[in-house]
Amino acid sequence: MQAIKCVVVGDGAVGKTCLLISYTTNAFPGEYIPTVFDNYSANVMVDGKPVNLGLWDTAGQEDYDRLRPLSYPQTDVFLICFSLVSPASFENVRAKWYPEVRHHCPHTPILLVGTKLDLRDDKDTIERLRDKKLAPITYPQGLAMAREIGSVKYLECSALTQRGLKTVFDEAIRAVLCPPPVKKPGKKCTVF
């Protein structure tokens, strides 16, 4: 059975642990407890192939910036996560997570994952964001970011309702088993 190491990164509180717990146990966890490091393992079938999927959770908080990369060696695929209702976490994909992952693992495939899909249409959440002159991240915005960082796929999911959840991990496995041609991140040409 092929073993695949999948490391999940992203800002604190975007839902990385909930994503993993909901996927591996079919239950949504209760309160928020920041992660240091956790590993989960799941035996799954994708396209008729059995795979042992090793899932590595990481801490998004800055305090762990020096510790986190210790989980990066031998990673087969990264999930860079952001919350669809946190524009700051979305901006950090470009500012922090993509550069960090690429620095340590220049050729490892990346999937960009928008979490908390159930909250994008939630009236209270939209209202809270509007009060700060912000709005949830749209699908086209996520897709544009995925293209910019050369992500293999852009996916959205909800760990609470499990909508799109299985697809995230199936596509992560496919990115390793049948790698697409290498995409270079979009380069911008500026003429003065």
UniProtKB/Swiss-Prot annotation:
Pfam families: Ras. Glycans are attached at residue 32. The modification Cysteine methyl ester is found at residue 189. Its EC number is 3.6.5.2. Disulfide bonds: none annotated. Plasma membrane-associated small GTPase which cycles between an active GTP-bound and inactive GDP-bound state. In active state binds to a variety of effector proteins to regulate cellular responses, such as cell spreading and the formation of actin-based protusions including lamellipodia and membrane ruffles. Promotes cell adhesion and spreading on fibrinogen in a CIB1 and alpha-IIb/beta3 integrin-mediated manner. Belongs to the small GTPase superfamily. Rho family. This is Ras-related C3 botulinum toxin substrate 3. The lineage of its organism: Eukaryota, Metazoa, Chordata, Craniata, Vertebrata.
